[in-house]
Amino acid sequence: MTNIVFMGTPDFAVPILRQLLDDGYHVAAVVTQPDKPKGRKREPVPPPVKVEAERRGIPVLQPTKIREPEQYEQVLAFAPDLIVTAAFGQILPKALLDAPKYGCINVHASLLPELRGGAPIHYAIWQGKTKTGVTIMYMVERLDAGDMLAQVEVPIAETDTVGTLHDKLSAAGAKLLSETLPLLLEGNIAPVPQDEEKATYAPNIRREQERIDWTQPGEAIYNHIRAFHPWPVTYTTQDGHIWKVWWGEKVPAPRSAPPGTILALEENGIVVATGNETAIRITELQPAGKKRMAVGEFLRGAGSRLAVGMKLGEDHERT
């Protein structure tokens, strides 16, 4: 019996853990991030992987710093023959990487060596790619740089968001792992080194990247909006007030105007000029301190003061 330790944290990792269990593998322990305080009461909320592991009766470890000996030794106590990771969120120490008989493998949501890092799904859409995928590779001390064991492509639809693509890639990763593990354990797979010259990176999203740059082409802004939907959500400003822009669509600009100019106020949309002939019609937004709403509702209320010719995104944030 192969003794497996699974390491993962968010929703992306849950179908992958389920696949291991459904395929009959023995998952001796699950390692995940600590519970995080959320909401107004700041009550601790367990990671999705912890919830699934406890539902299945699997021991759970939640190290704060996996690289510290007293913490990674708790993992080694389970004597793993193989460690499988998926969006765990911490860099593993050499002592863990070297311990399992079959090594440590990672299910990564990109076609490596493209988009190494913590936000490959966001960047795949943001960069306007028409395909991405999942790679299973050996883990090494460098970020997502290990030899590849398997890879599968997943097309990106023009209407995909980070949410929909996340689910497609998670399912594809679970299926690919199911197909790859028997080959790995039987020694019937040949690892392929990554081409370092083709490596690109997808670092974790920063707050300043959420702001829409209206000087960009309309196509790029549309990709930005859907790449940040439903998390962390793009935003713009109007007269110093923040609007979260939950959704928008590409439309031909009715006339020429400086980027960020409101070109039209429609029943269900605010049409905004961009850096080219493709405008963006905002259809769903969330003013600061308010609920998420359709633009039609906004224009009948707080947005009734808006007028064609007003500018978005050029002022300092107040709220």
From Swiss-Prot:
> Which terms are listed as keywords in the entry?
Protein biosynthesis, Transferase
Under catalytic activity, the entry for this protein gives: L-methionyl-tRNA(fMet) + (6R)-10-formyltetrahydrofolate = N-formyl-L-methionyl-tRNA(fMet) + (6S)-5,6,7,8-tetrahydrofolate + H(+)
Q: What is its EC number?
A: 2.1.2.9
Name a GO CC annotation attached to this entry: cytosol
**EC class:** transferase
| Family, similarity comment | Belongs to the Fmt family.
**What is the protein name stated in its UniProt record?**
Methionyl-tRNA formyltransferase
Q: What is the lineage of its organism?
A: Bacteria, Bacillati, Bacillota, Bacilli, Bacillales
